[in-house]
Amino acid sequence: MNPAKHNGPYFVGIDIGGTNVKVGIVDDNGKSLAFCKTKTEVDKGVDAGLKNIYQAITDVLSDCQFTMDDIKAIGIATPGTMDIPGGKLVDPPNLPTWKGFPIRQTVCDHYSGKKTIYQNDANAAAYGEYWIGGAREARSLVLWTLGTGVGCGIIIDEMIIEGRHSHGGECGHMIIQMTNGRLCDSGQYGTLEAYSGGKSLVRHCQELLDAGRSSLLHSMIEGGKELSPLLISQAAEQEDELAIELIMESAMCLGVGTTTLMHTIDPDMILFGGAVTFGGRDSELGQRFLQRIREEARQRAFKVPYENTIIDFAELGSDAGYI
């Protein structure tokens, strides 16, 4: 792709998650021109992650026959906790080796002062949906981002809710189980993320397998496959009882969280995106997952907000964060 043949300006978007990093080039209409996914490699520290990110940026620039001179600005999104005005991560549960890291200034300096903007990953994804995705006609939106953890972006009257201390929308850490709740990576017990985050889902699944629960997952793991949300999804598609139980429990908990936000915010739409949506709208399992969320919300929510709030999958899928 030659930049002379396309209308600029162009932007680099970087969506850093606890497992993967997504990097893309986007034009000012939100069209993705190139995309690359790489590993965060959290256990190896921030330098390893940055090396992968810089290489991914080089790759997408090459795909478009661009140089950094063709790029107007860089956008970076990470999971919380964070200091958005200060441009740094604070103490993110799913990026523990990035604690206190000044990501915005580091990337800006690496690219010779290129304008660099920093935002919470769920907020960025919510704005992507609001800008060019499934919430284009909405004035208020909640977007759940389901991945290694559970993020949440909130837009009310066209404004992203960042909060006074950059912690607005950390709804994955709402407490949904007061007694004997599961431990979350945040150090709290009974959070929504402890039940519906991908990392927690895998951990609880392993505990049940170790306790002797029957499942196809035993043979799948013994065959050399790594236990992951994807593997649990594959087992569920074969009607594995344990896998379906775990996914439906995750959906039930998300239904509880969705009800809470419905009563708190009363938004036009509540959408679900990210890598742990079990195939999303294109999958029968994904549709069962969504229907369980809706049913839990129907049972718990006031009638008027439930009947007038759209609950669906995000249109942009896992691309929303870097867009």
Where are these regions (language model features)?
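Short loop/edge segments at beta-strand edges and connector loops
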Residues: Y118-N120, A126
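Hydrophobic "anchor" residues
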Residues: K31-S32, L89, I160-I161
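Short hydrophobic alpha-helix segments
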Residues: C36-T38, P93, R164
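A charged helix-plus-loop insertion that forms the helical arch/lid used to bind
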Residues: G87-K99
